């Protein structure tokens, strides 16, 4: 009888433990509902690909796009909710993280229609491409919300591994293989450096891995001003710098941009910067709270080098994708100004707003490059000469996106930079803002040089690629034009309503 009662108690206790263990991930899963939608989309893609003999390509695009749109919708429905920490402190949900997650989802949603015709023309495997895009998006979203060092590293590697695979997706292309090799080697080295920095942070805080607990641990161990923290700061800055690609951590960027498939470059050029910026902001702001002067100085140096080197070297480029690679290095210098300013003078709000505009400007430019490259097979800047005479719509779209990247009024890029520089000026970053203004003028030069080529009408300057250019029917390239139209509109009109956008960002953050 006693044995029977004990056996029943054991079963009841075991059931309670099991239900508690099951309830925790089930309850916490509601905090990552947008990510769960993407996971479900990934599983659905895999199941259809593995079970169906006759694969309908349009279904793969539909499932991927629908997953992303549903994830955005789920994210918007929980907008401005109270901050929550889930999964035993590993993941944090707040307004700041959700804005960056929204930007990553927006990038991926625009990149998929941009890739449709390219994949069909190059006959690349579609399912794997979409799987890598969705998995990289998932990794970027988890990176934005990661609340401890281990989750940050795992999410970062999830994003990085998919990036390596995407950059080498055209296996028969020698340039793509070379770009992937460089990207993989430098990415592995930067990850090792980042983990080494994390180990110093872990040891100095007394064995803490959660970001806020690291601060408490540093106070308890009195190590917040120790040399170990400065070593951790240096190594972590180098590791994250690889993802942001500021100078001098930019060596991989031009080769990867030139060798990778153009839709992949479009995807990586924005998502990597958005995810890395979100992670860098939280790492610098929380664990290195007591070393703000040191990391401000480090980031100022990186921003100055990026703005000067990126824009000056871009002038000499003959490849459109390499030019945009160096342009992106300069652009990240402007974004770093917002990270340095922080939330004291609206730095975060202006940085997020500029990133929103940068996504539209950059993806719009790449949509034009994809469209032109599919019809001509060239990437040389000189081969764009006279494009306006053959395809005015494409030429005007490219010109507007480039002018917005350069920051000419009244386009979105101008107002984004203006507000970013104004926040930096109010924060006392006079030298940094002055460098930003000067390098913006330099960038206008090489953007205008391309626009001049586009608009030329003299026959002797029109290249054979443009002379033999044939615009296909609209229905054959409507997916690229869909992304192009959205990005061109976002690159031109929203700048006029800049103040409401900034106010929305500030109200959401604070």
Swiss-Prot record:
It comes from the Eukaryota. It catalyses: a plastoquinone + NADH + (n+1) H(+)(in) = a plastoquinol + NAD(+) + n H(+)(out); a plastoquinone + NADPH + (n+1) H(+)(in) = a plastoquinol + NADP(+) + n H(+)(out). Pfam families: Ndh2_N, Proton_antipo_M. It is a multi-pass membrane protein. The chain crosses the membrane at residues 26-46, 57-77, 99-119, 124-144, 149-169, 183-203, 227-247, 295-315, 323-343, 354-374, 395-415, 418-438, 482-502. InterPro entries: NADH-Q_OxRdtase_suN/2, ND/Mrp_TM, Ndh2_N. Its EC number is 7.1.1.-. It is an enzyme of class 7 (translocase). GO terms for molecular function: NADH dehydrogenase (ubiquinone) activity; quinone binding. One of its GO terms (cellular component) is chloroplast thylakoid membrane. Keywords: Chloroplast, Membrane, NAD, NADP, Plastid, Plastoquinone, Quinone, Thylakoid, Translocase, Transmembrane, Transmembrane helix, Transport. Signal peptide: none annotated. GO terms for biological process: ATP synthesis coupled electron transport; photosynthesis, light reaction. NDH shuttles electrons from NAD(P)H:plastoquinone, via FMN and iron-sulfur (Fe-S) centers, to quinones in the photosynthetic chain and possibly in a chloroplast respiratory chain. The immediate electron acceptor for the enzyme in this species is believed to be plastoquinone. Couples the redox reaction to proton translocation, and thus conserves the redox energy in a proton gradient. Belongs to the complex I subunit 2 family. This is NAD(P)H-quinone oxidoreductase subunit 2 A, chloroplastic. The lineage of its organism: Eukaryota, Viridiplantae, Streptophyta, Embryophyta, Tracheophyta. The gene is ndhB1.
